[in-house]
C-alpha cells in the first residue's frame, strides 16, 4: 500500500513539475492582467488568438508548453491569451491593431507596445523576441545601427547575416526590399574582408549555406571548400552535434549536382567536365552516398545523361538511361527517383508525349505509388496515372484513377490545395 501511495505521489509530482515549467497563463481580463503586471513590476505578454486558428493552436500546444519558454516568460512577464472573437475583447484587439493571427504583443506595464510577433514561430525565436522586448538583446535594427558605427566588427556582421532571413520574412513591401538589398550587399563585404580561409567554423559555414547556394565554372568559394574538405568538416564538427563531414558534403553535393543539371538543361556538353569532379576532388564528399550496385559516378552520369537527352527531346535515350539507373539502384530506389523524372517530363513535353512515353510513365507511377507519401503527392500521382491511361486509350481505367485521386484528396489538410486539386480532377473526368 505504501509503495502504491508513493508511486501515486511521484506521478502527481512529476505531472505538476511539467505543468509548472510551461508558460503560466493568467485567467482573467486584459485589465486585470495589466494590474497584476503593474503590481509585480513585470511587462505583459498577450497572445491574441481565435479557436479556428491552426497556427495559434501550434503555439499554444508546442511552444508555450516548453520549459525553456515557460522559465523565461514566467519570470519576466504576466502572460495572457485573448480570444479576438469574444465580444469583450474587440476593443483591445482593435487598440493593438490585431490584423492577423496569431499576433503576440509584448506590452509594458504602462500599456505601451514594446514589440510584436505575427505568425507561428519556433521557441528560440520567441524567446529572442522576448529578450529584445526586455532589452536583454538588440533588435535587428539596433544591431544594424551598431554595424554602421563599427563596420570592421566581424562578430556584428556575422550576427546580422545569421539573423537577417528571419527578420526580412517579417517585413513587407518597401521595408522588405530595403533590408534585402542591405543584406545582399553585406555578405560580399563580409566574405571579402574576413576571407574564406577564416570561415572554417559552424557559424560562418551556416552563412555560406544561406548566401552562397549556387556554384558556377569559376567559384573560388566552392573550390576552396572542396580542396579543404577535412578542415571545414573539423571546424563545423566543433560547434554542432553530429558529423561535420556530412554537413559539408551535403553542401558541396547539392551545389555540384544542381550545376550539372543546369548545364544539362541548357544543352551545355561541359556538364561532362563537371561530372569528372565526382571522381576527382569531390570524391570524398560523395563517398557516403549509395546507389545500389552503381558507383556514385555511374549513377550521377546516368541521371545527367538522361536529363541532357530529355531537354534535347531525345525520348528514347532518356528512357534508356533512366531504366539503367533504376535497374542499378534496385531495392534502394526511393519515391523521389520516380517523381523527379515524371515532373521533368511534364515540364519538357507540356503534356504532349508519345504513346510510348505515357506507357513508360504508367509503369513508373505504379511503382511510385507503392511508397508512403503525403496525401497531396498521392493525389497528384493518381491524376498523372489517369492522364497516362487516357492518352493510351484506356478511358475506363483513367476514370478509375481520377476517382481514386478524388477520394485521396479528401485527406489533404490544406483545404485550398484540396479544392484546387478536386476541381482539376473533375475537369479531367469531364474530358474523358
State the predicted function of each range:
Residues 1-25:
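Bacterial Sec-dependent N-terminal signal peptides
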Residues 22-40:
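N-terminal leader/targeting and pre-domain segments
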Residues 23-28, 48, 62-89, 98, ...:
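Thiol-based oxidoreductase modules, predominantly thioredoxin-like and allied folds used
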Residues 40-54:
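Short active-site neighborhood of thiol/selenol oxidoreductases, capturing the structured segment around
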Residues 40-44, 75-78, 101, 108-112:
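Loop/turn elements at helix/coil->beta-strand transitions in domains of secreted/extracellular proteins
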Residues 57-61:
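Detector for the c-type heme attachment site
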Residues 99-139:
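Non-catalytic, surface beta->alpha helical segment in thiol-disulfide oxidoreductase systems
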Residues 151-432:
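Oxidative protein folding and maturation machinery
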Amino acid at each position: 500500500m505504501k509503495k502504491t501511495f508513493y508511486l501515486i505521489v511521484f506521478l502527481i509530482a512529476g505531472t505538476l513539475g511539467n505543468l509548472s515549467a510551461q508558460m503560466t497563463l493568467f485567467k482573467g481580463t486584459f485589465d486585470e492582467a495589466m494590474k497584476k503586471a503593474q503590481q509585480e513590476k513585470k511587462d505583459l505578454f498577450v497572445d491574441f488568438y481565435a479557436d479556428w486558428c491552426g497556427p495559434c493552436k501550434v503555439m499554444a500546444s508546442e511552444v508555450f508548453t516548453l520549459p525553456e519558454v515557460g522559465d523565461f516568460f514566467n519570470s519576466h512577464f504576466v502572460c495572457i491569451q485573448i480570444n479576438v472573437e469574444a465580444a469583450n475583447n474587440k476593443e483591445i484587439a482593435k487598440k493593438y491593431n490585431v490584423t492577423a493571427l496569431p499576433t503576440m504583443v509584448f506590452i509594458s506595464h504602462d500599456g505601451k507596445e514594446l514589440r510584436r510577433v505575427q505568425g507561428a514561430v519556433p521557441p528560440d525565436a520567441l524567446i529572442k523576441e522576448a529578450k529584445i522586448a526586455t532589452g536583454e538583446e538588440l533588435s535587428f535594427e539596433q544591431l544594424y545601427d551598431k554595424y554602421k558605427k563599427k563596420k570592421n566588427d566581424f562578430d556584428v556582421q556575422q550576427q546580422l547575416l545569421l539573423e537577417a532571413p528571419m527578420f526580412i520574412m517579417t517585413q513587407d513591401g518597401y521595408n522588405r526590399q530595403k533590408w534585402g538589398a542591405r543584406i545582399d550587399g553585406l555578405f560580399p563585404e563580409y566574405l571579402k574582408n574576413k576571407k574564406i580561409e577564416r570561415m572554417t567554423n559552424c557559424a560562418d559555414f551556416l552563412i555560406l549555406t544561406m548566401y552562397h547556394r549556387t556554384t558556377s565554372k569559376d567559384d573560388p568559394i566552392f573550390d576552396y571548400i572542396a580542396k579543404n574538405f577535412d578542415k571545414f568538416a573539423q571546424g563545423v564538427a566543433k560547434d554542432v552535434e553530429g558529423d561535420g563531414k556530412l554537413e559539408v558534403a551535403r553542401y558541396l553535393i547539392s551545389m555540384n549536382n544542381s550545376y550539372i543539371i543546369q548545364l544539362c538543361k541548357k544543352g551545355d556538353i561541359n556538364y561532362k567536365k563537371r561530372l569528372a569532379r565526382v571522381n576527382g576532388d569531390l570524391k570524398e564528399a560523395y563517398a557516403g552516398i549509395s546507389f545500389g550496385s552503381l558507383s556514385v559516378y555511374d549513377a550521377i552520369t546516368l541521371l545527367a545523361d538522361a536529363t541532357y537527352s530529355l531537354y534535347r527531346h531525345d525520348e528514347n535515350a532518356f528512357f534508356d538511361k533512366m531504366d539503367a539507373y533504376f535497374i542499378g539502384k534496385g531495392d534502394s530506389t526511393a519515391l523521389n527517383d520516380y517523381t523527379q523524372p515524371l515532373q521533368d517530363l511534364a515540364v519538357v513535353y507540356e503534356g504532349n508525349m508519345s504513346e510510348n512515353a505515357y506507357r513508360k510513365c504508367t509503369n513508373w507511377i505504379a511503382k511510385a505509388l507503392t511508397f508512403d507519401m503525403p496525401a497531396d503527392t498521392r493525389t497528384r500521382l493518381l491524376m498523372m496515372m489517369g492522364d497516362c491511361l487516357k492518352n493510351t486509350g484506356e478511358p475506363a481505367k483513367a476514370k478509375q484513377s481520377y476517382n481514386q485521386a478524388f477520394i485521396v484528396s479528401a485527406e489533404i489538410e490544406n483545404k485550398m490545395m484540396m479544392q484546387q486539386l478536386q476541381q482539376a480532377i473533375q475537369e479531367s473526368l469531364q474530358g474523358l
